[in-house]
Structures are given as C-alpha cells and as structure tokens.
Regions:
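Non-transmembrane catalytic domains and loops of membrane-associated enzymes and transporters
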Residues: 1-209, 337-339
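Tryptophan-centered motif/residue detector
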Residues: 187, 194, 303-309, 313
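Hydrophobic alpha-helical segments and helix-packing faces
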Residues: 180, 184-187, 195, 214, ...
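Membrane-water interface at loop-to-transmembrane-helix junctions
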Residues: 145-146, 212-222
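Membrane-helix boundary elements
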Residues: 204-216, 232-235
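Membrane-embedded multi-pass helical conduit in multi-pass membrane proteins
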Residues: 220-305
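A broadly tuned preference for mixed-charge, low-complexity surface segments
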Residues: 101-110, 130-134, 171-179, 219-234, ...
C-alpha cells in the first residue's frame, strides 16, 4: 500500500519524467522471499542491465548513472556501488559500523576492483547483466547447502555465479546509504547471518577463484583461512603462551594495536571524520566479541534462518522449538505423575 501511494505521487507530481511509461511495480501473490522478488524483477526488466537494491537503501540522485559506467567493458558482469551509513551518529555501535563500512567499501572493495574481481557485489546497491542473472536464476532460487535451502547471502551467491566467468567491479561514485542496526542484539544476529553466508559462499568461490589473477587468488585464500583460524590464534597467543611459557604476548598485542590504529588513521586522514577513534574501538570489539561468532558459524553455517526478520525458515525453526518445548513439558508432567 505504501509503495502504491508513492507511485501515485510520482505519477502526479513528476509528469515530466514520464514515470507512467517508465515505472512499474509488481506484487508477488505469495511472499516467497527476497531472491524470488529479485528474480521476478529481472524477468520483467526491459533492458540489458538490472539494478538490485535493499529495501532500506537510499540512493544518491546520480547513483545508477554512475553505477552502469563500467559496463562499457563487455566482459563486465556485475558492479557494486558504495554504501555509506545513514545513521552514523546514533550511538557508538553505529559509529563503529560506519568505520567498518568505509574500510570495507572504499579500501577493500576498491582494491579488489583493481583486478576486476570484487568478491561480493553488496545487496544495498549492485548492477548485473540481466542475461547472467536469468541464466543462473533457477540455481540461485533453488540453492541448497547441506540439504538446507539458502535464503540469506543472496548477494554473495549471485556474485559467485557472475565472478566465475566474468569480471566484477566497484564504482565508488555510485553512492547509496543504509540504516545499520543500533541495538546490539540485532547487530549480533546480523553479523552471525553474514558470517554463515560468507563461509558458505567463500567455500563455493574457493573452487574457481584460483583461475583468476594469481595475486587475487592468493589474497582470497589468505582471507578465507585467517578468519577461520583467528579464534585459535587468539587463544594460542593470549592464553596458551602466557600460561605454558610464562611469556607476556607483547608482539601479538602490539600487532593488534597497530591494526586498530591503521583503521583509525585511515578515517582521520582520508575521511577527516570525527568517528576516527571508533576504528580502534571496533578492532577491540571485534577481538572481544565478533571473533567468537566464527566457531559458532563453523558448526551452524548450514542454518538458513534469517534471525532479524520472520522468513519461512525462521517460522519453521520456531515451530520446531515450540514442539520440543511442548514434548519436554509433557515428559516432565508424566514424570511428576509417576512420582
């Protein structure tokens, strides 16, 4: 209903843009999830490029115009735009995420783009060649992992289909902003979901990334192994070494501090932002909290529940837990009667 209202306003107030001829919206008869909605959009699209955006993305007026520029290269299969944080100054959590987004997009994705091998065309704003999306549509919609239907991680999954045989890039001038979680429970659920999808899709990408430019391949495999082994490395340096060898982990702590300072210095020099100190805070928070989500992701990466919204998989998971709770209650009641 809200979309319908917005479209009517556009038709009435933006007549010179001919929105009646250029803008259409479709409502799925049944809520089949985000992937199905994106696939439907690709099916009805009239031109050779399709743009995917998240429902909480705010696009710069020239975002799409800038986003499509790299497609002058006929081998280019997909391009990611830049995502900034819209609610940076809400609290310390959003400030930390703002620092992380800056590093993730303007440093890491920009580096990958140098080799035309961006590993994740992020959901807030990305563009694909329609023919590639339609070619892999059925595989994408019906993707399973360890027998479980894949729901989240649709951006990484589609990126893998594209990256396998095409180039992927990052366009820094195609800017959008997004609302990030400002409460820790929601944030932690989001991070767990992202880690599971990262692990799943990184394992998939590992089967073909070796065919890319050698430097890209080496950095990809290092980037895959290091986060997986990071909890072991931390335990070894902060617990095993001090207890067994009675040596203070100076080298490890100095390295951690230098990494945190690098994030802060980048914010201070390149962005000239007052949030620069939260680069240091984020690194410490990552080591203390987020790092320990990875072992959980190892043993639950097959799970497809969203965590922060009600998907069919979340509803099914709740139903199973409720059934288990009821069975346990019945057993306890039977035991009490026997006593």
């Amino acid at each position: 209903e809200k979309i319908d209202e917005i479209v009517r306003i556009l038709h009435n107030e933006a007549e010179r843009y001919k929105t009646k001829d250029r803008l259409s919206y479709y409502v799925q008869s049944v809520n089949q999830g985000k992937r199905a909605a994106l696939a439907r959009g690709a099916e009805v699209a009239k031109h050779e490029l399709v743009v995917f955006v998240d429902s909480d993305s705010f696009l710069d007026p020239f975002a799409i115009r800038n986003l499509v520029q790299p497609f002058v290269d006929l081998k280019m299969g997909g391009v990611a735009g830049r995502t900034d944080v819209a609610n940076t100054y809400t609290n310390s959590l959003t400030k930390m995420q703002s620092v992380r987004y800056y590093i993730s997009f303007r440093i890491m994705k920009a580096a990958e783009a140098y080799f035309d091998a961006v590993s994740c065309l992020s959901g807030p704003l990305s563009c694909y060649r329609k023919e590639i999306v339609l070619e892999h549509k059925e595989e994408w919609l019906n993707q399973t992992f360890f027998g479980q239907k894949a729901t989240f991680g649709d951006d990484r999954s589609m990126t893998n289909f594209v990256l396998k045989n095409h180039r992927t890039n990052y366009q820094d001038t195609a800017v959008c902003s997004t609302i990030v979680p400002n409460e820790y429970p929601v944030f932690l659920k989001q991070q767990m979901r992202w880690k599971r999808s990262w692990l799943r899709e990184s394992l998939m990408a590992g089967s073909f990334i070796w065919r890319k430019e050698p430097f890209v391949s080496v950095m990809f495999y290092i980037g895959l192994v290091v986060p997986i082994l990071a909890p072991v490395v931390v335990i070894y340096n902060l617990i095993y070494i001090p207890i067994v060898h009675r040596v203070f982990p100076t080298t490890f702590l100095v390295g951690l501090l230098m990494m945190a300072l690098m994030m802060s210095v980048v914010q201070l020099i390149l962005r000239k932002s007052s949030t620069w100190v939260f680069g240091l805070v984020f690194c410490l928070y990552y080591e203390a909290v987020l790092l320990w989500q990875m072992p959980i992701a190892w043993v639950t990466f097959w799970k497809s529940t969203w965590g922060t919204r009600e998907t069919p998989q979340d509803i099914e998971e709740k139903r199973k837990k409720e059934e288990q709770r009821q069975r346990k209650a019945v057993r306890l009641e039977e035991q009490s009667e026997q006593e």
